[in-house]
Amino acid sequence: MSRDDNGWSKLYPDLLRSIFESLSCLDFHRAGTVCSNWYAVSRSCPLYPWRIVFRGKNSVLFDPIQDKIYTKNLLGIDLSKIHCLASYGNWILIVDPRLDFYLLNVFTRETINLPSLESSLRGDRPFRFIRNDDESGYFLELYGTKFLLTWNDFRFEKTAILWVNGRNGDYVVAWAIKQFYIFSYKKIGNDDDDKRWSITCTQCEDMAYKDNKLYVYTFDHYINILDFSGNSPKEPMEENPYLSHPFSFVDAIYKLRLAVTREGKVLIVLSLVGLDKKICIYKLNLKIGDWEIVESLGDEMLIFGHGVTIRAPDKDISGGGLKSDSICFLYDDYLSDHYLTMKRQPICGVFDLATSTITWHTRLEDLSSKICWFVPGCA
């Protein structure tokens, strides 16, 4: 039967969804690229996070549900000498010691080179990057004042977002440095004429991106919104409700991150310190004009610091806590008893929002501490 006969790809969505959910993760991604109908159905299937470990010239991908390990040579370079800043679906945003930025597909090994920092910058102020003499970084120059930006600046400060359209290859990248400068690049369609980073000056403790909007949390506890629907980011004309309702929280905060739900609701995710160590979530209730605690994420879960929620399995399939209402995190996202007692801490874990319990993940932790969560198929 030819592909044009009898609507070969138009199976009933429920049937197609059940088939998709029975596939291995790799076959699931291949099936989702067959046609637009299959892609649409694949987007309604539950997802779950994998882990990736960077070591030597190989990376290790771990599927926790199938309990399988895949070893890949991704770039042909020492992967311990790169920083992974963000991920989206099968793609990760990385920066190397020369401060060259790339997008990398961890399954196909496709690489997209982002513009050099030495290219001119978009913005309303005279910014420019100047390569350091020993090529260890760049000087960012503004009105004759310079400060040095190096690879080590990204070791702990990983405030960045990545969004990739899995069908047409469009993408948006943004990262912040010195907690006051946001650099962004947007590729839409085949427009490759203007390969320049845009620069926006704004306070930035964290940020999240969804539907052409970049949500930026400031040090005075407000959330700014930047509109990415045009060629360069701008503050939208419509009213920003978050500017009238700063987030005030009295308990001790270890880390704060933004996230946006699939419906577009902005969440503030807190990792707390003190006797009541836990992770909690808040959202703005516009009816009462105040922030309220989120008791449940419904059928969604999130990764601490990844900026968006994902649809998730209803039940814990593997015993690792990966299900709806759970939050995946890394060792430096949560101040655990291991840290306080100077014991060796597991590299990552999963926090159950309903029970405030943690399932620690120890598989692969002997390989490297350079590990991150990513969600295959999130596109």
Curated annotation (Swiss-Prot):
<dbReference type="InterPro" id="IPR036047">
    <property type="entry name" value="F-box-like_dom_sf"/>
</dbReference>
<protein>
    <recommendedName>
        <fullName>Putative F-box protein At2g33190</fullName>
    </recommendedName>
</protein>
<dbReference type="InterPro" id="IPR005174">
    <property type="entry name" value="KIB1-4_b-propeller"/>
</dbReference>
<feature type="domain" description="F-box">
    <location>
        <begin position="6"/>
        <end position="53"/>
    </location>
</feature>
<dbReference type="InterPro" id="IPR050942">
    <property type="entry name" value="F-box_BR-signaling"/>
</dbReference>
<dbReference type="InterPro" id="IPR001810">
    <property type="entry name" value="F-box_dom"/>
</dbReference>
<dbReference type="Pfam" id="PF03478">
    <property type="entry name" value="Beta-prop_KIB1-4"/>
</dbReference>
<dbReference type="Pfam" id="PF00646">
    <property type="entry name" value="F-box"/>
</dbReference>
